Amino acid sequence: MKEAIVYTDGSYSGSTGKMGYGVHFEDGSGDLHGEIKNDSSGSRNVVGETAAVIIAVQTAIARGYTDIVIRYDYEGVEKWITGEWTCRKPISQQYRDKMHELMKQIGVTFEHVKAHKGNEGNNHADRLAKQGSGIK
């Protein structure tokens, strides 16, 4: 079993209107961040949050991991998958469907962490997401 532990986060800049994502791989295998372009869902940071999780899982699969632990601070990324939250908007429906597809290829465990409470892995993912959305 080869397990990845990742922290994911999303960000939205009100001044630029850009959305970003950040993914921190705890093992140092390479962090990811970027801007999400052309989103018209109006969901702002949620787009970044869900993109971060999908990109983390896709990257873990590509890197040969068999399992991934996703540490997140936005509850929707887990609760839409478990059905605790109803997927009312297209963004959450698309996220749920994509994750169910990806979860056939890799074991996924979700762990909630509190935002901005001194967790260095989460803080690092937050900084990456802000870079992606153009926040300095």
Model-assigned labels for residue ranges:
Residues 1, 135-136:
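Short intrinsically disordered terminal tails
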Residues 1-47, 58-59:
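RNase H-like nuclease fold core
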Residues 8-17, 54-124, 128, 133-135:
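RNase H catalytic domain
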Residues 48-52:
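Loop-to-helix element that buttresses phosphate recognition and phosphoryl-transfer chemistry
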